[in-house]
Amino acid sequence: MTAGDEEAAAATALPVTIELLLASPRSRYVGRPADGPEPPPAASELHESVELRAGLGIVGDRYFAKPAHRGASVTLFAAESLEAVGRLLGLGRPLDASATRRNVVTRGLDVDALRGRTISIDSGDGPVLFRVNRPANPCAWMDQVLAPGAFRAMRGLGGMRCEPLTDGVLRLGTATVEVDPADPRDVHPA
């Protein structure tokens, strides 16, 4: 790699923070929202780090290796989107990102602008490549677990469903994101 190549690579690396990592062995939002969510499992669903497998998802998560979720086994969500939902609803309190059931919550990245892109996230253990495939649409449970009106307010702000393309580990804390340099579109920090 030449000095020019290194400068170009550094220019495309976006500094972000991974604020939350969630891997749950089962879905807690089943049945009718009015009945409330199932209780959390004995083991914590929130993790300091998660292990990913190419094409399969997060080890230990409910969508890991499920054929129906190929291409959508990992959800990526921006903390700023949840803050925008709170403002739209006129709430004077922060919303709990873990209630959204998104796997990876970041700060400093416009996640919803990444559709159709390939990205890498490196939190210190080497880059993990993802294909960002489609929106992670909210469900009616959001009205129950976040706040009334959250289901509608999250439309277009629900994050993205991704497929890991490489094995790797993600950790809480600082990270860098690189957007596929072959793609001419430009993604800006949130």
Description of each model-found segment:
Residues 106, 159-168:
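Short alpha-helix capping/helix-loop boundary micro-motifs
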